[in-house]
Amino acid sequence: LFLTRSIEAHVTNSYPVLCRQDGWYNSSTVRELIRQSDQVWVASAWQAWDAALLPESLANLRREFGDKFVIFGTKDFGIIDIKKLLATPVPQRYQTQNQISETSRQINRQLAQAVGTTHFVDVSDLICGASGRGCRVFTPDGRLLSYDGGHLTVEGARELGSSLVDVPAIKNALSF
């Protein structure tokens, strides 16, 4: 977050490192890289409290660096239970779908509303689909998408990368 005030009051005891790392945008190297960039992708494991602060942060970033920021939503591919998956017969295994938490969906809706669809990428929707019915666990060729429900495997990252070219926020940057 690029704020002119401390976020310490918002950070829970489980995230003390955030307070110590607050101010990353004050690095002259980071600021120069942002200035030189045509587009900057901002990704985080967003929580409700920092998603609520994003509009203020984004306004500060735009004022300082211009309108070049694309916000990537929080990722949630459900709970991945490797032992359970391995115990599932192969044909059924590849049909497995997980539920995405309503909290994650709500945070992504909040982010999309705050920044607009031209500056937002809903990663969960790209991987899982916008239906909300569930999120597949495997790629079409049987490779695991995520090993922990929040981080992509190499195969999952490839699949996400191939779908990014059709996202308006990314497509516009690729057309220059």
Language model features with spans:
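Extracellular glycan-modifying ectodomains
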Residues: L1-F176
